[in-house]
Regions:
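Conserved N-terminal phosphate-binding loop of PLP-dependent enzymes in the Aspartate aminotransferase
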Residues: 1-434
Length: 434
């Protein structure tokens, strides 16, 4: 069947909210490692998808799912070793106090549950998030996703702190006497203002929820000390700190397993999602025994599919592959190689205003004017990402202006893969400049 025919069938059968990437939609039929293949046999280098974190259709993950599916799939009201083992293995990846898990199916569910836990345990209702954030699409979590709707429609229990954007934000790198520490303090002041605003409206904070990569904002690297200050402010007001690791977790940033580890702060609650199952839908909330016990006294939480043995088998296989194949080290080493290559691209192409990220997560901020840092028009950015796709490399866009090229490949991404991707981006930007 042709791509056009399938697209027409899709248009009739699926709701219009389902968007397709790229000007010419890609009809994918197979994946292997860092490669995706379309219906005509053409292969694409995947520089976008972090759900298949250990590579598309990794044999260990596929076999784990198939083996367990042949035996049994049920829920957490029965004993099963896979589920217990997954909780133990995850707990071992965190500081000792973060040792208790709830299992769900998606990052949205995990953020929803984390918010419920914070509200139940603290007895407070207010929430603090970053301006321009995205955390999921349930009714509750969508309200926490300030990128998704106008500020005038926000509930009065929500405070949106200024996102720590050191490139285009109100406080920029090199602009503050006192350097990075002063910059961190400035952005943390916005959190304090948010907490004060909640108090004026009759709320105390239950928690501050932060995406440790600020992905939807455009991949920000906050000034050192910001996150610890922000968490301290919220805790002093009686709230908890929730780290949303759906994007940043599972070795994505190259130096650590979790994004928050880069900023010297231990969360009260951690949310896991996308990469956890290597392509299988599984997510989790991790917290302390004390918080778990306090929540359990109030709410008997159960999730029909969360923590099923098949999902647990997939998630255990992902942990095995990351450790045995040295994918944290690979993300670090290839990330350093990418960093150098992206810096060279930025030197050659005035359209690149900034390059941000680490490990295997990079944002290439496209601008129409470097001096003013004016974001490139969203439509033009879409044309560029579609041109890159036509050359066989899949990337995405992010940021509030839709102008930041998102580079977020599976963890087995190699130096050769990186060089190929950089060559394609370079060629497309050269063609644009002609």
């Amino acid at each position: 069947m042709s791509t056009n025919e399938l697209e027409e069938r899709r248009r009739r059968a699926l709701a219009p909210a389902y968007e397709l990437f790229y000007q010419e939609p890609v009809h994918l039929v197979r994946g292997e490692g860092v490669w995706l293949f379309d219906n005509e046999g053409r292969r694409y280098l995947d520089c976008y998808n972090n759900v298949p974190s250990v590579g598309h259709c990794h044999p260990r993950v596929v076999e784990a799912i198939a083996t367990q599916a042949r035996l049994l799939n049920t829920h957490t009201r029965y004993l099963h070793e896979n589920v217990v083992k997954l909780g133990e293995r995850l707990g071992a990846k965190f500081p000792e106090k973060l040792s208790v898990c709830w299992f769900v199916c998606t990052g949205t569910e995990a953020n929803d549950l984390a918010t419920q836990i914070a509200r139940a345990v603290t007895g407070h209702y207010g929430m603090v998030v970053s301006e321009g954030s995205y955390h999921g699409n349930s009714d509750l979590v969508l309200k926490l996703s300030t990128s998704s709707y106008p500020a005038k429609d926000r509930p009065d229990w929500l405070a949106a702190a200024t996102a720590p954007d050191s490139y285009r934000g109100p406080y920029r790198a090199g602009s503050e006497p006192g350097g990075e520490e002063a910059l961190a303090e400035r952005y943390a002041d916005s959190v304090a203002e948010g907490v004060a605003g909640l108090a004026d409206r009759g709320y105390q904070p239950a928690a501050m929820l932060v995406d440790s990569s600020w992905d939807d904002n455009g991949l920000f690297v906050p000034p050192q000390g910001y996150l610890a200050r922000a968490a301290s402010i919220v805790r002093a007001a009686g709230g908890l700190f929730i780290a949303d690791e759906v994007q940043a977790g599972y070795c994505r940033l190259g130096d650590t397993w979790w994004g928050h580890e880069r900023y010297d702060v231990v969360p009260d609650i951690v949310v896991l999602g996308k990469p956890m199952g290597g392509g299988h839908p599984v997510a989790a909330v991790v917290s302390t025994p004390e918080i778990a016990a306090a929540f359990g006294k109030q709410i008997d939480y159960f999730n029909t599919f969360g923590g099923n043995p098949v999902s647990a088998a997939a998630a255990l296989a992902v942990l095995d592959v990351i450790d045995e194949e040295g994918l944290l080290k690979n993300a670090h080493e290839v990330g350093r190689h990418l960093e150098r290559g992206l810096a060279e691209l930025a030197n050659e192409h005035p359209i690149i205003g900034d390059v941000r990220g680490s490990g295997l997560f990079w944002g290439i901020d496209l601008v129409s004017d470097r001096e003013s840092r004016q974001p490139l028009d969203r439509a033009e950015a879409k044309r560029i990402v579609s041109a890159i796709c036509r050359e066989g490399v899949l990337m995405g866009l992010m940021g509030s202006h839709g102008n930041v090229l998102k580079m977020r490949p599976p963890l087995p991404f190699s130096r050769d893969n990186a060089d190929h991707a950089l060559e394609v981006v370079d060629g497309c930007l050269c063609a644009l400049a002609r």
